[in-house]
Amino acid sequence: MKTEKNAQLRLAKRPQGEAGPDDFELTHDQVPSPRDGEVLVECHLLSVDPSSRTHWNAGQSYRSMVQVGQVIDVGVAGRVLESNHPDFSAGDYVVGPGGIHEFGVIPGDQLTLCDTRIAPLSSWLGGLYMTGLTAYFGLLEIGQPKEGETVLVTAASGAVGMVAGQIAGIKGARVVGVAGTDEKCQFLINELKFEAAVNYKSLTLYNDLREATPDRVDVIFDNVGGPLLDTLFRRLAIGARIIVSGATSQYNNETIY
């Protein structure tokens, strides 16, 4: 292991607008060794989420920014190779914050043990990790949907949106999704059993929304922001709740909408 190289993707420079290949650098370094309380993880799966884009800018955010030269930070799931933390042993599968690399040293206190008998490793990094928890707590603690209410989810075919829509359905709400293609809208209706779905690129967007939400909208779970959210405001019911989960339409913009 000590002679094996560790492929890592680093931030070469801060992107201007949409990120491209020149903004990143692939390096090959020595595999690191864990210190006290740390765990060496062989990364099998990476969760590269839209919110990662916000960490590559200059300035401040709700979390620390990736500095130029640093490894791009993402959620990872993988196998423990070496552990200096009492809760983990070699061979365990874990999920937690890491980077785009083959091998990473992660503080054990930031890792969760994955029982792959309960769910596959991909689920531990998806619906049972950050995207699923974002949907779960955002919808239930802030949205608090009630049976019979209308819940509208933007970016509904994305990782967070799909889970939010399923939870809303379990709670007995009427679920409407917004997505960017007709194929995604059909997926929401046919596979995820949304009551209705609207393509936000439609030339008749507001009329489509009005038809899909005849009783207006009680809860908006918004992952997109920008002009689309402005349009959705016009469909709000009295006493409506809005979960501001993300703003994917704005992550590549240099100016705030």
Placement of each model-derived feature along the sequence:
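Short amphipathic alpha-helix with an adjacent loop that forms part of the alpha/beta core around
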Residues: T204-D215
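Glycine-rich phosphate-binding loop and adjacent beta-alpha segment
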Residues: P227-Y257
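Short, glycine/polar-rich helix-capping loops at beta-to-alpha or helix-loop-helix junctions
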Residues: H101-E102, G180-L188, E254-Y257
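Glycine-rich beta-strand-centered segment in the early N-terminal region that forms part
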Residues: Q30-V48, W56-I100
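Short glycine-centered segments of the SAM/dcSAM-binding site in methyltransferase folds
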Residues: Y93, T150, R174, A240-I242, ...
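NAD(P)H dinucleotide-binding glycine-rich loop of Rossmann-like/cofactor-binding domains
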Residues: I72-E82, S89-A155, A197
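Mid-domain Rossmann-like dinucleotide-binding core that forms the NAD(H)/NADP(H) cofactor-binding site
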Residues: L125-L203
